[in-house]
Amino acid sequence: MAEAAQQDAQQNFAIQRIFLKDVSFEAPNSPDMFQKEWNPDVKLDLDTQSRELGEGVYEVILRLTVTVKNAEDTAFLCEVQQGGIFSASEMEAGQLAHCLGAFCPNILFPYARETISSLVVKGTFPQLNLAPVNFDALFMNYLQNQAQQAEGEQA
């Protein structure tokens, strides 16, 4: 018990920087889209990736792509790559993977969501507020899929 408390006390996590890595907004059917009744179909794709920049320093990128169609036509497509540089040390491999795959994207998401909302409004479309994402559940699902694939390869 004392060892676990000591290990937790040694763990270190810090946000060094949050930055916008890439952004794109396309409204291919403007201004014709503004003349149509607004009944949007919103599709959200997200992905994360991370890489080590130096000892205990990691870049995490959260990529959000929002495609909104109205009827059959694309109203707009918005892609944001929100980046962060984080320092993390004295973590076990599983803890570090969870930190980079769930905790850090959870920190980045509000920044990416705000950028998307701002771009959509600047395109003069109705405001788009993305619902919160449970990155912990997505990460656990990813781990389960990896385990199933590993079992399938062994069989």
Curated annotation (Swiss-Prot):
Signal peptide range: none
Domain of life: Bacteria
GO cellular component, one term: cytoplasm
Keywords noted in UniProt: Chaperone, Cytoplasm, Protein transport, Translocation, Transport
One GO MF term: unfolded protein binding
Predominant cellular place of this UniProt entry's protein: cytoplasm
Keyword Transport: yes
InterPro entries in the record: SecB, SecB-like_sf
UniProt subcellular location: Cytoplasm
GO annotation, biological process: protein folding; protein tetramerization; protein transport
HAMAP family: SecB
Free-text function comment from the UniProt entry: One of the proteins required for the normal export of preproteins out of the cell cytoplasm. It is a molecular chaperone that binds to a subset of precursor proteins, maintaining them in a translocation-competent state. It also specifically binds to its receptor SecA.
Similarity remark: Belongs to the SecB family.
Subunit composition and interactions: Homotetramer, a dimer of dimers. One homotetramer interacts with 1 SecA dimer.
Protein's name in the database: Protein-export protein SecB
Organism, as annotated: Vibrio atlanticus (strain LGP32)
